[in-house]
Amino acid sequence: MVGASAISGVVIIANVVAAIAAAAGDGDGGIASTTDTILTLDGIKILNNALLQWKDDCNQRALAEVMPQCIHGVENITPSQQKHTAMELSICEFENNGLDYPLECHASVRNLNTNTCIQALEKSPQYWTTFSGNYRAVKDICHQISLPYEKDQIIEVYENMTLLYRSVMEDLKSSHHKYTVELEMKIQNKFNKLFSVVDDLMRSRAEENNKVNQTFNKFYENFQVSISNALVVMQNSYDGANTNFELMQRHVSYFATELQRILLLVQEQGEKLQVQQEQLVTGNVKLSIQQERLFDNMQLFGNELDKLHNAEVSRVSSVNKQLKLTEFSIRHANSILRENTDELHLQRMLIAEYTPIILGNITTLLMHFLNQSASEIVENFEHSLNLSLEKLSLKIDETANSLAVVNATIARCSIFASSVVETLDSLKNSTIRMMMLFMSMITPSVTFDGLISGAKAIIAFFTLVTRLAAVIAICLLIILIWPIVKSLFFQPLCYLMRRCSYIVVSILVGVAAANFSVWLLQK
C-alpha cells in the first residue's frame, strides 16, 4: 500500500513536470495556465498523505531514532539508542498482540525515564525475553529495513524538488508580470508626453501662424527622433522579453529533461524495490522461522535459567547458613580469645611478680651448683695432682736409681778416663825420652835447649790430642745419658703441666658460663 502510494505520487510529479515542459513555449499565457495547474494539483497532498500513513506505523516510529544510522551504516548505532529502540519495539509487540505490560512502560512514564521501564521488564521473564530478543535483533532489523527508508528518503527528495520547481515557476511568473507592467507604464508615459507636445503645438499654431512651417519642420524632426527612439526602446524591450522567454524555455526544457530522466530512475528504483520487497518477504518468512526457533531456544534457555536460579537460591541459602555458622564460630572464638587474653594478662602479672623470686632461687641454685662443681673440680684436681705426684715420685725414684747407675757408669768412665790419661802421660813421657834419645843419636851436635823446645812441642801436641779425646768422651757420655734423663724428668713434668692446664681451663670455662647465665637471668 505504501509503495503504491509513493509510486503514484512520483507519477503525479512526472505529469506536472511534463505539463510544465509542454507549456514552456506558449508565452505569458502558457506560463500562467501552467502555474494555475500546479496550484490546483492535489498530487502533493496525496503523496504527503501516503508518507504520513507510512510513518504512523508503531514499529517505524520505534525505529525513527535509528533511521539515520540505519541509512548511513548499522555500526553507527550507539548502545543507548539500541536499548531505547529495543524497548519501543517490545512495547509495539505487546500493543499489537493486545498484551498488558508494566505501568512504568507507558508513554507518559517511559519518556521521562527509560531505565525504569527496562527494570520493570526485567522483573518478568516473558517481558525480559522479548526485550532481550529485540535488543539483539535491532541491528538485523535495521539492516533489513534500510532499503525502505532509502526509498522514503528518495520520495522526500522528489517532494522537495517538486516544491522547488513550483517556487521557481511562481518566481518566473511574478518576474514576467512585473516586467510587463513596467514596460507598459514606460510606453504609456512616453505617449502621454508625446500627446502633450502635440497639444502644445496645436495651440501655438493658432497663435503663431507665421512660425508654423519652421515649427512644424522642427516638430517633424523632433517627432521623427522621438518615434525612432520609441521604436528603438520598444524593439529593445521586445528583444529583452523574447530573450527572457527563450532563457526560461531553455530552463523549463532542461527541467523537463531532468525530470524525465529522474522518472526513469524512479521507475528503475521502483522495479528494484519491488524485487527487494519480494526478497524482504522471503527474508521475513525465514526470519519468522528463525524467530520461532529462537523462541523455542529462549524457552529452553528460560527453563535452564529457572533451574539455575533455583540451584543458585539453594546455594545462596546454604552459603547463608555457612555464614551464620561462621559468624557464630567467630563470636565463640572472640569470646575464647578475650578469655585467653585475660588469662595471659593475669599470667603476665604473675610472671612479673614471681620473676625476681624465681631468678633469686635460680641464682642461689646456680651458685650452689657452681660451688659444688668447683669443689668437685678441685677435689678431682687434688686427686689428679696426688696421682701425678705419686707417679712423679715413682719416676723420681726410678730417676734416682737411674742416676745411681749413671753415677756408677760415670765413675767407671772417669776411672777409664784417668787410666787413659795416665797411659797417655806415660806414653808421652816414654815418647819424649825416646824422641830425645833418638834426636841425640841422630844429631849429637844438638844442644840441650833445642831438645827442650822439641820436647815442649811434642808435649803440646799430645796435650791437644788428650783434650780432644776428653771432649769426645764427654760427648759420648751426654749422648748415652740424654734418653735416660728425658724419660725420667721431662716426660712426667710435661704430663703434669698438661693435666694442670686442662683442669684450670675447665674451672675458668665453668665460672664464665655461670656468670653469663646469671647475667641472662637478670636481664
From Swiss-Prot:
GO cellular component, one term: endoplasmic reticulum membrane
Stretches assigned to the Cytoplasmic side: 491-500
Signal peptide: 1-22
Subcellular location, record wording: Endoplasmic reticulum membrane; Nucleus membrane
InterPro entries: Nuclear_fusion_Kar5
Major place of residence: endoplasmic reticulum
Coiled coil spans: none
Residues of this chain annotated as glycosylated in UniProt: 160, 213, 361, 371, 386, 407, 429
Membership in a protein family: Belongs to the KAR5 family.
Its biological purpose: Required for nuclear membrane fusion during karyogamy.
Name of this protein: Nuclear fusion protein KAR5
